[in-house]
Amino acid sequence: MADTEHQPLLEAASIQYDSLRDPYLNLPPDELGLSIQSTLPGTAPEGKTLTWSSAYILVVSRVIGSGVFATPGSIVKSVGSVGLTLLVWLVGTILAACGLAVSMEYGCMLPRSGGEKVYLEYTYPRPRFLASTLIAVQAVVLGFTASNCIIFAKYTLFAFDIEPTEAQHKALAVGLLTAITIVHGCFLKTGIWIQNVLGWVKIFLIAAMSLTGLWVILFRPYGDSIGASQFRPDHPFAWDTVWEGSNWSWSLLSTSLFKVLYSYAGLNNVNNVLNEVQNPVRTLKTVCPAALFTACGLYLVANVSYFLVVPLEEIKNSGELVGALLFERLFGDHIGRTLFPLAIAISAAGNVMVVTFALARVNQEIARQGFLPWSKVLSSSRPFQTPLGGLIVHYVPSLLVISLPPQGDVYNFILDVEGYPGQIFALAVTVGLLLVRRREPFRLRPFKAWIPAVWLRIVVCLALLVAPFIPPPDRKGDVHFFYATYAIVGTSVVLFGILYWYVWTRLLPRWGGYKLEEEVDVLDDGTSITKLVRSNE
């Protein structure tokens, strides 16, 4: 423990190979959530198709989606001031780094596809099947990419100055989701190439657009016609006004932190597809920190540009269109309202592509463990050597979330309801890391998270889980219905998973006089799967 207390948060731990023992010395084989083989570097039927640059884009495109353009408006509306908004982004960045360190240690220790599914199964082998069931329920119920499909549709229609009906808005969002599912399901290499191109275009566009705002304000190429009013004594960055209007309600601060953490969601995206990554451990240790620094820099510059160019009240009332307001004020109605919103739509589309790519692999891993119906079909990579079954499992809930809820608060609600169960699993993974360190002190760890970062992550997860139930001063959250609805829905999903697990693995076997056993099978395409079969007692 003493060795780790002086290590920087994202520094790889040195490895003393001659001091290592059997990594499974302290854990009986019958108590492993995964077999020994399943914790070794795996190879997907698709092969090692992801290079370092592809892995970097997979992470950056997942992290930098619509959040940098869509969430600042709702965050400012919740917290009320420039200073508190930037403070929330800073705290969220630090917390994201803590979570990333935990994911990197797990990923280097268990370098195979599946992400949190693998880590929870390995860490919590008892009660049997519980961790796997909860991950499966979350993947099916909350494993969607609806939010960025919604942003894509909203910014595309805004760019063409169309006042859409609700049906048109939803149809465009569903069209994007469907097209991406078809590309990833039928054309593996083409899909990877497209998402790589979109990723680099996205980084260039976001950097250029954000830096343009600073350039216009700082160098005044158009004189005082743009942004001059921002340099009065009541300028948003003047110290006497920077905290004006701050709302320190922990309930609202927590929802804002959820949104910031959502904007950083996906820093561990490469953990979900390590079977397809070349040199997975080395790539993981360099790609993730590089993506974190990239996202942090772009987010900081973008937020400063908003506050310098767009009046605070307009930001608060902008909803998800604050990015469009920035570009409209800088470049006028034609360019600002057309080209730049289209660039934001491209950013959202790139995010949907990489999220779909990664979550399809997670769903396929869940199916291979026998925790989804029709597991043979969903586990197979035929006929296109792609996880088509996993894509279908991802497509259905995303389609329903886009199509069924009414417009209005749906974007904020989706962000919140996705974030809450994620904090529950993040807490379980972080506590589990400490348990594994104690249980297996001699296990090979190519990367080791800084222990204060691990404890900070635990404390913040607990605080964020409690915060939604603390009433805001006016008993109003960031939606027009009950402020804690998202926490109740998120908790209900987890409780439903526990109930389903109990009925499926405990109650029904007790009534039927059988027990569930794992049986290994190999599909025609060479994929190894686990079937859960009934065995009479």
Role assignments for model-derived ranges:
Residues 42, 46-151, 261, 270, ...:
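Transmembrane helix-boundary motif of multi-pass solute transporters/channels
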Residues 97-177, 181-182, 348-362, 410, ...:
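Hydrophobic transmembrane alpha-helices that form the core helical bundles
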Residues 112, 136-150, 259, 264-277, ...:
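Membrane-helix boundary/coupling elements in multi-pass transport proteins
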Residues 376-388, 426-491:
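C-terminal membrane-solvent junction of multi-pass transporters and transport-like membrane proteins
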